[in-house]
């Protein structure tokens, strides 16, 4: 027997998120339920994009730090943002990189939408690989960003070979670290 979704009940719906209870029948025929949080808007499409932006020839990656109320602390993350209706992931990546960091770059590739935390949400996120021309931002320059009024984003240029040390320093400052950064560090430790 295949797993079957029987019905879904919305418990709460807000501007950006909704919470629902999903009733399903598992592979053994047992009726079960699950609580989930979903993004609102853009049904059937990816909801957000996160950006791995490499500054060349400096071999640096752009990271941000901002307070995240659900985590209750400052988080170190890759730049990211929601895909607006009518936008492509590429357009969103260019816009969000500029708004959050002030950097302008070109999109090298975008993945299909992947799931950020499939045990909790159906949110689909696209990874945008971007390249920034470091000659436009010499001597470690960080341009003025264009963040929204509600944001308080700090921007970092981190040498790829120094990423592990940077993460340790941020942990020592009691910052949370986005799991995507730990994934990048793990791949780096494998020599990939």
What is each stretch, according to the model?
Residues 11-52, 57:
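Acidic, metal-coordinating catalytic segment for phosphate/diphosphate chemistry
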Residues 70-76:
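A conserved beta-turn-beta hairpin within the catalytic core of GNAT-like acetyltransferases
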Residues 56, 61-64:
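Glycine/small-residue-rich phosphate/adenosyl-binding loop
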Residues 2-12:
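Short amphipathic beta-strand and strand-loop transition segments with alternating hydrophobic
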Residues 62, 77, 127-129:
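Conserved beta-strand segments that form the floor/walls of ligand-binding pockets within enzyme
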Residues 176-192:
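Short, amphipathic C-terminal "tail helix"
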Residues 48-50, 81-175:
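Unchanged
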Residues 38-40, 66-70:
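Short, solvent-exposed aromatic-acidic interface loops
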